[in-house]
A protein has these predicted regions:
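Mid-chain, well-packed structural core segment of small domains
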Residues: 49-90
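Hydrophobic transmembrane helix segments
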Residues: 14-51
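Membrane-interfacial loop-to-transmembrane-helix junctions in polytopic alpha-helical membrane proteins
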Residues: 1-4, 40-47, 72, 76, ...
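Hydrophobic cores of alpha-helical transmembrane segments in multi-pass inner/ER membrane proteins
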Residues: 11, 55-61, 103-107
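Hydrophobic alpha-helical transmembrane segments of integral membrane proteins
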Residues: 82-112
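Transmembrane helix-loop junctions and nearby membrane-interface residues
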Residues: 17-27, 63, 67-70, 92-95, ...
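Interfacial segments of alpha-helical transmembrane regions
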Residues: 1-14, 80
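Short, charged juxtamembrane terminal tails flanking transmembrane helices
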Residues: 1, 115-126
Length: 126
């Protein structure tokens, strides 16, 4: 199997950030022109826009870190799969029409036991 979990997370992060820019472009322009200090707490719309963008950046960092671990051949921790699954399930329950569904494949892949006795990272290095 190819290394794909980190790349998947990076792709989701890029997509998430693109959606943020599409949905909140006007809000970001207003935040920029009015000054960034405290811009994320001016109202609920500004807060949502700020969190949407910041979460995309965090997801990108996580995806890049997972990619680095996959390339090194080190084992990806099962706790990452548990955390991603928890995030996906809670996100889907709170917002069924959302991108949280895209977090399920890597979460489940991280939780799936190796069939040949190798760890997940070695198996994905294929």
């Amino acid at each position: 199997m190819k290394r794909w979990i980190g790349r998947w997370l990076v792709a989701v992060a890029v997509l998430h950030t693109g959606v943020a820019l599409a949905l909140f472009g006007n809000t970001y322009r207003t935040m920029w022109s009015d000054g960034l200090w405290g811009a994320g707490v001016r109202d609920a719309g500004h807060s949502a826009a700020a969190w949407f963008l910041l979460f995309g950046i965090l997801a990108l960092a996580a995806g890049l870190a997972v990619s680095a671990v996959e390339r090194s051949g080190a084992r990806l921790p099962r706790s990452l799969g548990v955390a991603l699954l928890g995030l996906a399930v809670l996100g889907i329950v709170l917002m069924p029409v959302s991108g949280f569904w895209l977090v399920l494949p890597p979460a489940l892949a991280l939780l799936r036991p190796a069939r040949d006795g190798t760890d997940r990272a070695a198996r994905s290095a294929g």
